[in-house]
A protein has these predicted regions:
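Short, strongly hydrophobic transmembrane alpha-helices
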Residues: 11-41, 51, 440-467, 478, ...
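Small-residue-rich transmembrane alpha-helices
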Residues: 32, 357-423, 466, 759-821
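Alpha-helical transmembrane segments of integral membrane proteins
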Residues: 15-29, 303-323, 356-368, 397-405, ...
């Protein structure tokens, strides 16, 4: 150990410290990325008996084929049922330990605490979910106050602790306190639960037992597919067997679906083929997500790549460390084997060498804790990560790091220790192991392996970034660069719904008078996002499904949609509709076609069952024109049938402005703020989005991970460069005499540099051949979620290889320049 400490400040100390720093940096990157990976892979695993807690889906191939004809984004699995079918499921199997239905009657509501004098206080926005009474037997709630028995009274609600603090302050007790809901009357607090972790499908909302009347209505409803079912299977129950049992026991269930699936809740997160469309409840797009219970999807490919990068960074750093250890063998081998000649035993010598590796790895791990602590304290990666990086929240990640700390010294110290002591002492003392073929091949093999791994990451990232560039720059069929969207908060939008003209008309009029604005309009959905309203309407005797955008009469000219036939809206065209070409081709539509909206009435019989009775349909709209197809949603969805429909007094959510020039955006925003303050008296707080802003929000997960992958890729490349730096340093020292002799026989400095560079370029070429197909496969896995994608150009691979080659050549040239410039006489005589 004395020799070890002395060597820290020897000529080889710089390489040691560089290696130690690289390993420490790898630990930091591993911790940050792996914490995020663990956040995803442990999604909804906090439930008791998590493997038996399932969400129920069904498949119906005929329905899927029909729906995909009109909606390409319709998925294979569907999770929303009619209440009647859910009752059939519950009545036809005994394989559920417990089960509850969640009725889609939720509304974003205001909940007002009632004070001691019976006066309502400041309301708080929340969401109410109505369920059947087995909720707490399926999901695991951490009840802080109250008793789940109180849930059996539909006058009680259970709320999260965060909402209790907003309603009543941070001092309890809360149970028994009264609140007034704007859509469901007075309720009592029956219990308070600890907020769910962020990696859960379950939202921190208000849960209330559905009234018997509401349950009866849903149980008898065969038509409205808006309800969901969550179950806990009995021990030993198999989802496939339960599905077969249901199909055998009920003709209604056989008619409804081809099969039923019981997917563990922790697996639902990574499902990409599940439809939740009927659960949309409109809420602010930018600052909130659409309220869809359980609609949180993770991209398994991106998470897998992120985990791969985290491990590769550490693995590459470990290889670097092994390579450095092997490069030090020629400096250790003679000293160790001289000791063997004088009687030293192998085991103590090997243990002495391994102690150095143990101390190095422990030092690197300890050193990494400082930047990790700094990152946690300053919340540096909050914009990129979902995970909480605090040490107490990442036990699995810390255990993984501990495993590396234990295993790495065994490999990095064990192999060189065995290698140094495995030769006959006499041969070692008389020979020169510095340039032995075995040692050289091993070092180059490790470097090649490092570069193969890092090039896989770099090439994959290059392809990912090409698709990202495409998302921002591809033609979308309207003038995205000139569009500025102002979002009206939901609360104010609801307030002005019945008096739209008192806010919208003065606002639009003022905007049109500004010379920096070419046109202004409004709509109920933003363009370029995944959220759009769907309609099923009757036309020519058939029910047609299409996306619909409710707009002002001048919307098409504002956004730049181009007519192909017919005319644009006029202020008198109430309920006029303009369809895209996809709709015309699929449905054979023509100008003048009329659409009708089906209407139903629910009649309750003496037993309390509801029957849905059709009523005469009402006119929904008529076609006045057709327009070119445009990417009105995100690039994950194919262009589907879509209509713009002009309707007054609708729920206005977005003011849409066409700028005279993109550079005038800030000027226009200031003007809109001034007008908004005057018209709404400061009650409306507009949120502004450009076209690129909406793209960023739509692909926020992908873009966050791409940023993380970018930094990870940089480090996976830098760490092998450190290895190249050390290896060239070693080889130039070991080959000083060879270089001198070559120069005596006429070799030039340029020739020497080319010799060194060609060795590494050949290695890089082999690495590229191996890495390119792997990167191609990884990219294809990710790109499958996009209906529209950029072509995979060959030159992307060439450019990536060229950049890597240039950086490596610069590193090799800089490091070997001094040796190549030395005078031959000096190098030969030394």
């Amino acid at each position: 150990m004395k020799d070890y400490l002395k060597n820290l400040f020897a000529a080889r100390g710089a390489a040691f410290w560089l290696n130690l720093l690289g390993l420490s940096l790898a630990f930091v990157i591993f911790y940050v990325l792996m914490a995020e990976v663990m956040w995803h892979v442990t999604f909804d695993r906090f439930h008791k008996d998590a493997d038996r807690v399932c969400q129920v889906f069904y498949k119906n191939e005929d329905v899927t084929k029909q729906r995909k004809k009109v909606d390409a984004s319709w998925d294979e699995r569907v999770t929303t049922f009619s209440g009647f079918i859910l009752k059939e499921i519950l009545d036809n199997t005994q394989q559920f330990e417990s089960a509850f239905c969640l009725f889609n009657t939720n509304r974003s509501s205001k909940l007002s605490p009632i004070g001691a004098e019976g006066k309502e206080m400041e309301p708080v926005n929340t969401v109410i979910w109505h369920c059947t009474d087995d909720l707490f037997n399926v999901f695991t709630f951490d009840i802080i106050e109250g008793d789940t028995a109180l849930f059996h009274d539909s006058n009680n609600v259970f709320i999260p602790l965060s909402l209790a603090h907003k309603l009543f302050g941070e001092e309890g007790p809360y149970v028994g306190r009264k609140c007034m809901g704007d859509s469901f009357g007075e309720v009592s607090i029956g219990g308070v639960y600890r907020d769910f972790p962020t990696n859960s499908q379950i939202t921190n909302d208000v849960y209330q037992l559905a009234s018997q009347e509401l349950q009866d209505r849903h149980w008898s409803d065969k038509e409205n597919t808006t309800d969901m079912l969550f179950v806990k299977l009995r021990k030993g129950a198999n989802g496939k067997q339960v599905s077969d049992e249901l199909m055998a026991n009920s003709a209604e269930l056989r008619e409804w679906a081809d099969s039923y699936e019981f997917v563990p809740l922790h697996d639902v997160y990574f499902m990409q083929d599940a439809t939740y469309k009927t659960l949309v409840n409109y809420k602010t797009f930018a600052s909130h997500s659409i309220i869809i219970f359980g609609k949180r999807n993770g991209n398994f490919t991106l998470v897998w790549v992120l985990g791969l990068v985290s491990m590769l960074v550490l693995f590459i750093a470990a290889i670097n460390y092994i390579n450095f250890s092997m490069a030090m063998v020629p400096y250790q081998v003679k000293d160790v084997n001289i000791r063997r000649v004088f009687g030293a035993r192998k085991f103590p010598l090997r243990w002495n060498l391994m102690q150095k590796a143990i101390v190095n790895v422990l030092a690197a791990a300890a050193l990494s804790l400082l930047p990790i602590y700094f990152i946690v304290q300053h919340n540096l990666f909050a914009d990129w990560l979902n995970a909480d990086l605090a040490f107490g929240q990442n036990g699995y990640t810390l255990l993984s790091m501990l495993g590396v700390v234990v295993l790495l010294p065994l490999v990095a110290g064990g192999y060189p220790a065995w290698y140094v002591t495995s030769r006959k002492p006499a041969m070692v003392i008389n020979g020169n192991f510095a340039l032995s073929p075995t040692g050289r091949a091993l070092r180059r093999g490790l470097i090649a392996f490092q570069f193969t791994l890092s090039m896989i990451v770099l090439l994959t990232l290059t392809l990912f970034l090409s698709q990202t560039y495409y998302l921002y720059n591809a033609s979308v069929g309207y003038d995205r660069d000139l569009i500025l969207t102002a979002e009206i908060p939901e609360e104010y939008s609801q307030e002005i719904r019945m008096q739209t003209m008192t806010y919208i008309n003065p606002m639009i009029k003022a905007l049109r008078e500004n010379p920096a604005i070419k046109e202004a309009s409004w709509s109920n959905f933003p363009l370029g996002t995944e959220f759009f309203g769907g309609h099923g309407r009757i036309c020519n005797g058939d029910t047609i499904w299409f996306d619909a955008q409710i707009v002002d009469y001048n919307y098409l000219s504002t956004v730049g949609f181009k007519l192909t036939e017919g005319r644009e809206f006029t202020p008198e065209d109430h309920n006029g509709m303009i369809f895209n070409e996809t709709a015309r081709e699929k449905f054979g539509l023509k100008i003048g076609d009329v659409f009708y909206e089906p209407r139903y009435n629910y009649i309750r019989d003496e037993q309390g069952n509801y029957t849905r009775v059709p009523e005469p349909p009402v006119k929904f709209g008529h076609i006045i024109g057709f327009m070119e197809d445009a990417h009105y949603k995100d690039f994950r969805s194919e262009v589907a049938p879509m209509a713009c429909r002009f309707a007054n007094n609708f729920l206005v959510r977005y003011i849409v402005v066409r700028l005279a020039s993109p550079e005038q955006k800030e000027e226009v925003i200031r003007f809109m703020e001034e007008q908004n303050q005057m018209i709404s008296d400061g009650r409306c707080k507009l949120v502004y989005h450009t076209g690129d802003d909406l793209v960023s929000q739509t692909y926020v997960k992908d873009l966050k991970y791409l940023e993380l992958l970018t930094y990870g890729a940089i480090f996976t490349f830098l760490i092998p460069l450190i290895g190249v730096f050390g290896l060239v340093l070693f080889e130039t020292r070991a080959k000083r005499k060879e270089i001198g002799i070559r120069k005596v026989f006429g070799a030039t400095t340029r020739g020497i540099l080319v010799m060194f560079n060609m060795q590494y370029l050949r290695t890089l070429a082999v690495c590229f051949v191996v890495a390119a197909p792997v990167a191609y496969v990884l990219y294809n896995e990710w790109i499958e979620s996009f209906a529209y994608r950029t072509p995979m150009h060959w030159w992307l691979f060439a450019v990536a290889f060229l950049i890597v080659a240039i950086v490596v050549c610069l590193t090799v040239t800089i490091q070997s320049w001094r040796a190549a410039k030395e005078r031959p006489v000096e190098t030969i005589m030394k």
